């Protein structure tokens, strides 16, 4: 819990320092990942940080993923938090297409 609190504080400092206009993208590979990614939204809401959630699959909708990553900076995203189960390619694929920091979240496969 101490680590999470320090992370939360540092995360807010980074986001707020860059610009009040920036927001966070929370991207998941499928709706089944929403329960895990909801923890991210809780932290962001607690700090009053703007965010958008999106379901984009690196495997099922690669064109959509490519378009999202290529336009993320133009769309005022300062950080992307991406999570997916299985092979978890989503964070790496998005990261390869943008200069925006991407945080990968491992999600348990069922």
Identify the function of each model-found stretch.
Residues 4-7:
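Short hydrophobic targeting helices and cationic amphipathic motifs
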Residues 22-60:
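Glycine-rich phosphate/diphosphate-binding loop of Rossmann-like nucleotide-binding domains
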Residues 97-110:
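Short, acidic/small-residue loops that bind anionic groups at enzyme active sites
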Residues 33-38, 62-65, 84-93:
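Short glycine/serine/threonine-rich phosphate/pyrophosphate-binding segments
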Residues 68-88:
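Short, structured active-site "lid" loops
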Residues 53-73:
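N-terminal beta-loop-helix "entrance" segment that forms/cooperates
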């Amino acid at each position: 819990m101490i680590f999470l609190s320090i992370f939360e504080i540092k995360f807010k400092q980074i986001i707020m320092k860059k610009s009040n206009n920036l927001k966070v993208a929370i991207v998941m590979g499928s709706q089944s990942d929403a329960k895990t990614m909801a923890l991210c939204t809780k932290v962001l809401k607690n700090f009053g940080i703007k965010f958008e959630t999106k379901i984009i699959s690196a495997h099922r909708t690669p064109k959509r993923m490519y378009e999202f990553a290529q336009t993320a900076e133009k769309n005022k995203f300062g950080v992307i938090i991406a999570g997916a189960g299985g092979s978890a390619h989503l964070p790496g694929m998005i990261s390869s297409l943008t200069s925006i920091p991407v945080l990968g979240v491992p999600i348990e496969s069922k």
